[in-house]
């Protein structure tokens, strides 16, 4: 108990000392956004790299110019029950928050396979089925949706919402918007593409030599290999569509309509899959 309390105190201190905060539910791809921003800032400010994603070290090199970013775990929402998710975000008051979301069905599928294959340090190994998991009280689909809803328009907190899907469809464009939101000025436009190319999650094989991520930073969505003989090209565009039973998809769609506010910046209606 004391150890957990002291850990929360240290995190709170880091949030208070920071200029901007990166926040996401686990399995939303936050490491990718973090390292993309880190590569961009090393290029823009002409700083030495160090450990990829370590914003504190970048800030220490030039405190007068570099915004101090902190990647927050936001009280580990994947370990919470729905009624434990807090709407109150006053700890982030006065900060610029970058909130990353992802299609919740992909998030919950990815989280299930991570827990059922390897588990979490702070969670027990999950033995149930995917259909069981999405209906769990602790860290289930309802918890995820209520967490998303809590970040729709929190009082007195500035939030720039980024979707995982947009991040991968147009990483340079998303990076440009994020840098403007963070107040980074006089940017050479070519740096956005350069940062993308130096980030392994976006830049292909050449980027792997230009920027070395921390171990495990670029885990792909943890979905099992298909055993039905389908080729990659024949698989649905959304990974979750091949993981859930039709009843589960219908249930999750109803949950999304019930818990996500109408103004939540996400796809309220499903896109047709070709």
Question: What annotation goes with each model-predicted range?
Answer:
Residues 29-43, 161-186, 204-205, 220-221:
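PAPS/PAP-binding and catalytic site of the sulfotransferase fold
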Residues 47-52, 183-194, 204-205, 262-267:
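Short, surface-exposed acidic
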């Amino acid at each position: 108990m004391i150890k957990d309390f002291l850990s929360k105190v240290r995190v709170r201190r880091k949030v208070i000392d920071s200029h901007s905060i990166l926040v996401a539910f686990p399995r939303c791809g936050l490491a990718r956004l973090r390292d993309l921003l880190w590569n961009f800032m090393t290029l823009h400010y002409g700083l030495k790299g160090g450990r990829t994603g370590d914003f504190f070290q970048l800030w220490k090199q030039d405190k007068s110019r570099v915004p101090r970013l902190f990647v927050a775990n936001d009280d580990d929402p994947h370990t919470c029950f729905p009624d434990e998710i807090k709407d109150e975000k006053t700890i982030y008051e006065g900060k610029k928050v970058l909130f990353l979301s992802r299609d919740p069905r992909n998030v919950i599928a990815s989280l299930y396979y991570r827990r059922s294959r390897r588990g979490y340090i702070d969670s027990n190994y999950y033995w149930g089925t995917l259909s069981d998991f999405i209906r769990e009280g602790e860290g289930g689909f309802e918890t995820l949706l209520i967490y998303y809803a809590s970040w729709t328009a929190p009082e007195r907190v500035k939030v720039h919402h980024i979707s995982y899907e947009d991040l991968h469809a147009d990483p340079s464009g998303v990076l440009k918007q994020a840098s403007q939101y963070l107040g980074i000025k006089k940017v050479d436009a070519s740096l956005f593409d350069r940062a993308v190319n130096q980030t392994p999650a976006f830049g292909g094989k050449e980027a792997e030599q230009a920027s070395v991520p921390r171990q495990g930073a670029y885990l792909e969505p943890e979905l099992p290999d298909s055993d039905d003989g389908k080729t990659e090209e024949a698989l649905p565009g959304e990974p979750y569509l091949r993981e859930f039973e039709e009843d589960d998809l219908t249930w999750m769609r109803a949950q999304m309509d019930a818990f996500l506010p109408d103004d939540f910046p996400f796809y309220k209606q499903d896109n047709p899959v070709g």
